[in-house]
């Protein structure tokens, strides 16, 4: 089952996500929380976990992903945009996943510095990550 929590900023997405993850884990489900919010660093705290490393960095960071997106745009859609190969949870490097008590967390990417620029590569990666998982 895949479940996506979305909404306006400040409406409680992180709180609902953490509560849902805890409840599903308490029922014996294996839970993977995918943090796709590039500007909010709070979800790992709601889950009581350490902050994970950005998944995006394992793929060349924002610069590497941005170049893939630009190549796709220059092809005017003739090339297929594929950031990730097909994968399973076991294929995700262990250093990019944090977790305990039946809950695992992966963070797609975060804006770490003021004025860092566009988060478009993170959005594209998040979309494909969730589709292929």
Where are these regions (language model features)?
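Hydrophobic anchor at the beta1->P-loop junction of P-loop NTPases
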Residues: 5
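Walker A (P-loop) phosphate-binding loop of P-loop NTPases
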Residues: 10
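Conserved lysine of the Walker
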Residues: 13
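N-terminal phosphate/diphosphate-binding loop that engages ATP/GTP or pyrophosphate donors
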Residues: 25-101
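Phosphate-binding/switch loop-helix module in NTP-utilizing enzymes
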Residues: 78-133
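Hydrophobic positions on the alpha1 helix immediately C-terminal to the Walker A/P-loop
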Residues: 16, 20
């Amino acid at each position: 089952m895949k479940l996506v929590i979305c909404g306006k900023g400040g409406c409680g997405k992180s709180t609902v996500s953490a509560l849902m993850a805890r409840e599903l884990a308490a029922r014996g489900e294996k839970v993977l929380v995918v943090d796709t919010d590039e500007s909010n660093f709070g979800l790992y705290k709601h889950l009581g976990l350490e902050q994970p490393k950005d998944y995006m960095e394992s793929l060349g960071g924002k610069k590497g992903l941005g170049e893939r997106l630009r190549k796709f745009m220059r092809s005017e859609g003739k090339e297929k945009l594929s950031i990730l190969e097909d994968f399973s949870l076991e294929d995700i490097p262990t250093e990019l996943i944090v977790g305990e008590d039946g809950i695992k967390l992966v963070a797609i990417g975060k804006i770490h510095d003021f004025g860092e620029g566009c988060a478009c590569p993170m959005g594209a990666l998040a979309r494909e990550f969730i589709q292929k998982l």
